[in-house]
């Protein structure tokens, strides 16, 4: 009867050792993945090139300085904003205009209050 007790204790020890091995592997991979490099700031990656942001139709459109373009994209965005402003001044879709203005103001506040130097 002592042999059955010895076999069960050795299998329990083997199971415990296997469990510890799996736990060790899991945590080593977890910490290796968590130890990745911190991404650099946008200004450092772009070589100091600043981005000009414009909000149009509830979307953020970025145009980098030095991009090749004829300027029609910006004038189209400005024209769309002017048309929406004219429609709002006429009193059409007043609730929609107020909601659009609040959303664009909140979006601009978010853009300008981000902490660029902190990861």
Curated annotation (Swiss-Prot):
Keyword Signal set for record: yes
InterPro entries cross-referenced by the UniProt entry: Phytosulfokine
Chief location: secreted
Domain of life: Eukaryota
Signal sequence bounds: 1-34
Entry annotated with the keyword Oxidoreductase: no
UniProt GO molecular function: growth factor activity
One annotated Gene Ontology cellular component of this protein: extracellular region
Cell compartments where the protein resides: Secreted
Keyword annotations from UniProtKB, A to Z: Developmental protein, Differentiation, Growth factor, Secreted, Signal, Sulfation
Mod. after translation: Sulfation is important for activity and for the binding to a putative membrane receptor.
GO terms classed as biological process: cell differentiation; cell population proliferation
Positions where Sulfotyrosine occurs in the chain: 110, 112
Pfam family, one: PSK
Prosegment location in residue numbers: 35-109, 115-119
Annotated function: Promotes plant cell differentiation, organogenesis and somatic embryogenesis as well as cell proliferation.
Family: Belongs to the phytosulfokine family.
Identification of the protein by name: Phytosulfokines 2
Species name: Oryza sativa subsp. japonica
